[in-house]
Amino acid sequence: MRWRRWLTTVTGSLSVAVFVGLSAAGGWFYWERVQTRGEESARAVLPHQAADDIPKVFAYDYQTVERSLAAAYPLLTPEYRQEFQRSANAQIIPEAKKREVVVQANVVGVGVMSARRTAASVMVYMNRTVTDKSRQPLYDGSRLRVDYKKIGKQWLIAYITPI
């Protein structure tokens, strides 16, 4: 009788341990798959999105600069949007109107630097043509590190760093 109780206890304990171990392994494999799919999705989506977003953020005409920049605000995370708006109101808009600046931006290359399920960084190669009231165009090539953050189902620009 004692032997049977001991065997039942050991069998039950082992069953619980096996169940917990298999559940943990299954959860780990599931989460790893979620992470990998999120990374693959970011690598597939963000190069095209960055090529589309960056000209919207950097291109403007002095006559419509407020409208152009306002159209770019939804592309930014709420935190970066506040910083970008402060910079736009303090520097970009007044300078654009004063010097009658027209900026055209073209993305010539994009590469993913790092990608995770909810955040990624891309390198953007951008050519800009800046024309002011002197009507003498200035051509400028830039490299930008663009950090993206996924909020809900949407990738938004979290920060732009010139390199």
Model segments located where?
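Amphipathic, hydrophobic N-terminal targeting peptides for secretion and organelle import
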Residues: 1-36
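Short alpha-helical linear motifs
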Residues: 8-11, 91-98, 108-112, 147-149
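Short, flexible segments with low predicted structural confidence
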Residues: 17-25, 43-45, 93-94, 120
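Short leucine-rich amphipathic alpha-helices used at interfaces
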Residues: 20, 26-27, 33, 45, ...
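Short alpha-helix boundary/capping segments
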Residues: 38-41, 45, 136, 140
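Core segments of small alpha/beta cavity-forming domains
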Residues: 41-97
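Surface-exposed, charged secondary-structure patches
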Residues: 96-130
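Exposed beta-sheet edge and beta->alpha loop/turn motif
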Residues: 118-163
